[in-house]
Structures are given as structure tokens and as C-alpha cells.
């Protein structure tokens, strides 16, 4: 069955060391983990296919693993929303309800919102209070190819990391 996996998925980086061409981002994220200075909200922006979502997933897996050797221990604390196809107010309301519940094991629940620019304005507005004042046990990671389409009020409180194209 492995022979039928799309190359992009099969070769997706699983650690920061495997990410190609985003040294400043991976360095920043590794330092944040090492010093336990994690922002509660991150916005990754940049062109399609440069590693934004991969970096988000790697970070999400490592956040709760600081004391654990097994990277699968806390994978149930990671939630991913593809905003390209789940961009309604109802989708966001579900997240708003879920974030109130702290993780049963581990310190954080991590929400990755991929293609964040695809959220409707109504969905962004429904999400705004949660994004501006997330519970202490929540980390949000938004990834977008079109930062200019993300509501201007959101990036103010976010740590913004720009990914760039790499020529190999």
C-alpha cells in the first residue's frame, strides 16, 4: 500500500531537521520549545508548498513531548481544521466549545487552522474572542498562503513567521 502514497505525503518532513529551506523558522520554533517560551498563537504565511503546515504539525507534536520520549503519546491533543473546506461559523463554534475543555494528559491542546484565509468573515468574527484570549492550555497555529486575506485584527496578537520559497 505504501507504493500508492502521494510523494508529497510520503516525503513530508517529520522533524525540524528534515525541513528544507526554512532555517529561520525551524530555529525560532526549536528555541521556543527549548526555552519553554511558546507563543499561544502563531501565524505561518508564505507560498504554497514551502513547509508551513509541515512545521505546524512538527511543532504541535513536540509541544507536549518535552517530558516524554514517545511522540505519539499526545497526538490526540492536536486538532487540524482545513479551512478551505470547513470554513463556516458552525465549524468555528465547535472549536470555540472544544477549547474550553483542558487536555486530560499533557499541558496543551494545539489547533492547526490550515488555509486560514479561507475562513469566512462571519467565521473569523465568531472566532475572534477565542483567538484574542485563548485559554492557557490552548495554542493556535494558523497557516495561510494569503496573509492579506486574514482579518487584520487577528495577526496583532500572533507571532508571525514568514516562510519563503527555496531554490534547490
Language model region names:
Residues 34-35, 39-73:
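Walker A/P-loop
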Residues 83-103:
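Short glycine-rich substrate-engagement loop in P-loop NTPases that contacts/grips substrate
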Residues 101, 125-142:
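Conserved catalytic/switch belt of AAA+ P-loop NTPases
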Residues 114-115:
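Walker B catalytic acidic pair
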Residues 121-122, 152:
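Conserved D-loop-proximal element of ABC-family nucleotide-binding domains
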Residues 160-163, 167-168:
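Single conserved hydrophobic/aromatic residue that forms the stacking wall/gate
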